[in-house]
Amino acid sequence: MKVLYGTPEFMAPEVVSFEPVSFSTDMWSVGVICYILLSGESPFQGDTDMETLSNVTAARWDFEEETFSEISQQAKDFISQLLQKDPRRRLPSAGALLHPWLQHSQPSSSKVLSKERIRQFLARRKWQKTGKALLALKRLT
């Protein structure tokens, strides 16, 4: 199946490229969600949807030192295995459930996730949606 539907920063590269989608497409989105939950930032979000889609297509992302310095190596490995550009190289759902990061019963860090970063992330998305709505209205008039 081929589709182009979704929120740009959560789309897998194969969706942007109109290539067939599969379960591994959803695993990409799980990687994006984990990145956001741990950092309060999107790995691919640009200033515009086109910039975001370009970042996704190139699989251009990294673990910023300031944000991820206290995040475990296992968590970063989990995300890295999910954000593979090639869907065949992505961690499948069964492998994800067996990943050491999810198998650990005790958190290895006492770091508190930044509520402010999450708020900023959500506020930015809200403004971008408002801008898109205004552009759509402008096209109708």
Segments from the language model and where they lie:
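Structural helix C-cap motif within protein kinase domains
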Residues: 39-42
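C-terminal regulatory tails of eukaryotic serine/threonine kinases
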Residues: 94-141
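Conserved activation segment of eukaryotic-like protein kinases, specifically the C-terminal portion
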Residues: 2-11
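A conserved short helix/loop substructure at the end of the activation segment
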Residues: 83-95
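Conserved end of the kinase activation segment
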Residues: 15-24
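Conserved C-terminal C-lobe helix
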Residues: 70-82
